[in-house]
């Protein structure tokens, strides 16, 4: 779930389920990339105000067992930061496109006249709930270093 400051709703928060990837299989790095069009509010909002949060749940991985997905023991990760367009001529754009299209192959066939662009979340803060007792303190560098060493679970 990506949440932005809505330009269409007078600055109200707006949450939207969006496809993402943080690397090609086996080479995840933790930085989420998105393939968005300004026909969608998420891209429009980010171009007006880059502040964004992106929330993931452990539940789709199947590791929560039969626990209610909203139970604190089923981890939830929220990344906050700036959602920015990736320069389409940069090496990062090629990496992001490979990551997105390997996870979501149908993206390659999306309508060209919708002018999809690659965005990335520049992570500034991390909020992790994986048990009772409040969020766990994790810095962006700890998160990204762990993702580089272990392969991020975001891609799974």
Model-found features: residue ranges?
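Short hydrophobic-aromatic micro-motifs
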Residues: 32-36, 79, 119-121, 127-128
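Conserved hydrophobic/aromatic beta-strand scaffold that supports enzyme active sites
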Residues: 1, 15-19, 76-80, 118-120
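Short glycine-enriched loop/turn motifs at secondary-structure junctions
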Residues: 27-30, 77, 112
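C-terminal edge-of-domain segments
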Residues: 92-156
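An N-terminal domain-cap segment
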Residues: 1-47
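Short, structured beta-strand-loop surface elements
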Residues: 10-12, 39-103, 116
């Amino acid at each position: 779930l990506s949440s932005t400051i809505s330009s269409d709703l007078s600055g109200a928060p707006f949450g939207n389920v969006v496809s993402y990837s943080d690397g090609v299989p086996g080479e995840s790095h933790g930085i989420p990339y998105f393939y968005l069009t300004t026909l969608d509010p998420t891209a429009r909002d980010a171009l007006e105000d880059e502040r964004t949060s992106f929330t993931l749940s452990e539940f789709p991985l199947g590791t929560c067992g039969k626990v209610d997905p909203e139970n604190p023991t089923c981890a939830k990760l929220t990344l906050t930061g700036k959602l920015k367009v990736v320069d389409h001529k940069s090496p990062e754009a090629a990496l992001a496109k490979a990551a997105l299209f390997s996870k979501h192959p149908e993206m390659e066939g999306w309508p060209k006249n919708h002018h999809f662009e690659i965005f990335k979340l520049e992570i500034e803060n991390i909020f992790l709930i994986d048990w009772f007792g409040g969020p766990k303190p994790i810095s962006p560098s700890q998160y990204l270093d762990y993702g580089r060493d272990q392969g991020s679970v975001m891609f799974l």
